[in-house]
């Protein structure tokens, strides 16, 4: 099972380190990642494998949201199938 994670906020040191550390703590593997900074705004999209995640999806999303608040960015997570259906034309 896979999920999509988005991260947005003012650029600062340690964003990728914090997010990847949180994912490692709950046994989530990063499959693909893209990130950029546009005029001081950090954006990142990750595709992750949640098949071995140590918590349920709702808790997973909540942990990421809290981590985002801790570092001043917005982090959202969706099941891959829901994300794909939301972004289908």
Segment roles from a protein language model:
Residues 1-89:
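A conserved regulatory-domain signal marking ACT and ACT-like small-molecule sensing domains
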